[in-house]
Structures are given as structure tokens and as C-alpha cells.
Amino acid sequence: MISTPLDDLDRAILKLLKKDARLTIAEISNQLKKPESTVHFRIKKLQERGVIEKYTIILGEPIRPRELALVVLEVDKPIIEDFLDRYMEYVTKTLSGFPEVLFVAKSGKEKIVALVGGEDRDKLLKFIEENIESIPTLRSVQVLPISEIKKGDEISGFLAEV
């Protein structure tokens, strides 16, 4: 999973910061019953090693998309193989330009996976139909509406644009 070894203290610090990045060194130190100097040093080292890249926010429910869908796009294989790479790049950039598209990834040579969010189910499906399914030379578009999130509910709040 990760190539940088972490000990129990590093993991405990990361767990607390992941839950609330606003915690002060003193608060972390009190919760872990470790000296502030130790916690400060460890956080600094985690940043230097790239384990902590940045501190950010997760948007709350009032501003998150209410409906989500995974969209799997399969691109038609062109006669000239080089065109497939260019077209995949075009489609991923096009998708990335929409604020409703929260996440875009290539899967293999011909598939793209996107997480799309919307205010309600009708608007979400309309957006997908008008803006994604209309992209030329797609072999197929599979829309998988998400009915219930079992783990990672905050991801849409992290990915959503303001």
C-alpha cells in the first residue's frame, strides 16, 4: 500500500489529523500522551517525507451533491491505435472540465470511470445524457446510480467543487 514505513505513533497522529486537521500540536500531544516536541517533530518529518502532502477541508452535506453515479465509458477502438490514446485523453479532459464530474480515471486502454454528482436524480441523469452520453465515438456508457454509501461518505464532500 505505502512504501514509507510508519510506526504506531505516526499512524496515531495521522488518524487524528485525518479526523480533524485543525487540531493543534498541544491537542494531539494531550490525546496521545506524548510530549509536544515529539509530536511536532513527527509531523514535520511526515511532511518532509511526503506522507502529509496538504491540509484540506471536506464540504458538509448542505453543499455536497445529493445524488451520485459511477459512469463507465467504453471508447470505440479506432483503426489507428495512436488515435485511441489521443481520444482517451480528450474524453478525460472533457469530463474533468465539468463541475458535476467529481473523479475521472482511465481503466485499461479503452475504459474511463467517472464519479458524477447532482442535486437530484433527474438532474444527474439529464446531465449524464446531455453531456456524457453525447460524446462521440463511445461504444457504451454504463450508468450505475449509487443508492447507499457504506464507506467513504465524505468523499463527495472532498471532491465537490464550490
Curated annotation (Swiss-Prot):
Residues 25-44 bind DNA. This is Uncharacterized HTH-type transcriptional regulator PH1013. Residues 6-99 form the HTH asnC-type domain. It holds the Pfam family AsnC_trans_reg_3. The lineage of its organism: Archaea, Methanobacteriati, Methanobacteriota, Thermococci, Thermococcales. GO terms for molecular function: sequence-specific DNA binding. PANTHER family: HTH-TYPE TRANSCRIPTIONAL REGULATOR PTR2, TRANSCRIPTIONAL REGULATOR, ASNC FAMILY. It comes from Pyrococcus horikoshii (strain ATCC 700860 / DSM 12428 / JCM 9974 / NBRC 100139 / OT-3). It comes from the Archaea. Keywords: DNA-binding, Transcription, Transcription regulation.
